[in-house]
Amino acid sequence: MKVRTRIAPSPTGFPHVGTAYIALFNMCFAKQHGGEFILRIEDTDQLRSTPESEKMILDSLRWLGLNWSEGPDVGGPHAPYRQSERMGIYKQYALELVEKGHAFYCFATAEELDQMRAEQQARGETPKYDGRGLKLSQEEVARRLEAGEPHVIRMKVPEEGVCKFNDLLRGEVEIPWAQVDMQVLLKTDGLPTYHLANVVDDHLMEITHVLRGEEWLPSAPKHQLLYQYFGWEMPTLCHMPLLRNPDKSKLSKRKNPTSINYYRDIGVLPEALLNYLGRMGWSMPDEREVFTLQDMMDNFDIQRVSLGGPIFDVEKLNWLNGQWIKGLTPGQLLDRLLTWKSDRSTLEDIAAAIQPRINLLSEAVNWAGFYFNHMPQITAEMFESKKLTQEQVRQSLQFAIWRLESQFTWNNDTVSQTLMDLANQMGIKLRDFMPTFFIAIAGSTSSTPVMQSMVTLGPDLTFARLRHALEIVGAPSKKEVKNWEKLNESLKLPKNEATSEA
């Protein structure tokens, strides 16, 4: 049987380095065994999935040098490769499980389930679906379906015993069935959950090995059960260690930039980033640190993966990138520099921004330098204001990050409107509100128009600079984050509603 692996990203945001990390190991594993690596888009979350995000993911993986033999952009014998284009398939399989007695209808409302969880928590129990749908008679189910009542389809799960499955890195894994919820397979809108779509697609696309992050370990019993219910052979599982911040916490954008595009935009070479991701929990047999993708594929052995959480250290990545840069000829380096900032549209935007401010071409360097720098040189003292308290400065940065992150359209209108609305809702005059952002983005209040600068820099560099500024002035504590999230949401409400909310 030919080895087939896959990466299945969800197009709900910016392309994550964790996606590239898992894709790299899937591709190397497949190539090691003379197999195939495919890409599937898991866009069942129709509210958050966007074509723009999908394009960014595909483009960023291609930029790194990762290639797939089948996918939404190249086609293949198992098309379509977007789950949103396969919706009719999933309902068919969910109904098959109901007919076989492995799944059931549940008509519980969201309010009823919330009350159930609240009562369980009051008794000191872990919130979990109580199986109420299993108690309905066939007649009642038929009557309620006929009446068109909203419902979901849930899978049956054993109440006792232990689920056992093998993992390539961990050996036999045991998880008590009591810890496994009766997972929803088909939602009230008829769309599948990740678990059903994932299992059905992996089977139909003949995936033989599933290499994924260890956060999916608790879901493995559900998937094993679904394979048993359908009578299908389950792929071999391999749960990779998660990338972590230097403090050993799970890699998050709050502590480290996580977008592939960010590292591309600051001048990390694709070979260097791929090289660095290859060193996450894995090493070459000769322990050398600098190696190519081909080197990794030629020497790949999944058993060399260490389960200790690999640390994503930006300083180490920068050092490794330096090794790659030093290995180039001057001519090759020039080619890379020109490619790095060769987008004419972006350069024209920068030229338009600095044009009213310069009399000599040589003055362009001072005005445009911050567009090309990694991060502006800023201090906490630079943010001191006669008009704003330190709390207002901190909150304005954090609220702006949260609000801008929800914008999938990144242009002058959306960025400007977001910041102007925030200033208005915080009760701060725009002329007093904006200096914080000039300093965070450009390192000075004497700069090109900051909202346009944010658009030109793009979301990844903008978020990195805003988070850097927030760290400088004082990032919120966990307790503050919870309070600020509520405050940020209440600010969006009409004043009378916001008052009652508070």
Curated annotation (Swiss-Prot):
Keyword hit for Cytoplasm: yes
UniProt keyword annotations, A-Z: Aminoacyl-tRNA synthetase, ATP-binding, Cytoplasm, Ligase, Nucleotide-binding, Protein biosynthesis
Motif ('KMSKS' region): 250-254
Location relative to the cell: Cytoplasm
GO MF annotation terms: ATP binding; glutamate-tRNA ligase activity; tRNA binding; zinc ion binding
The keyword Aminoacyl-tRNA synthetase appears for this protein: yes
Family stated for the protein in its record: Belongs to the class-I aminoacyl-tRNA synthetase family. Glutamate--tRNA ligase type 1 subfamily.
UniProt-recorded name of the protein: Glutamate--tRNA ligase
Organism: Acinetobacter baumannii (strain AYE)
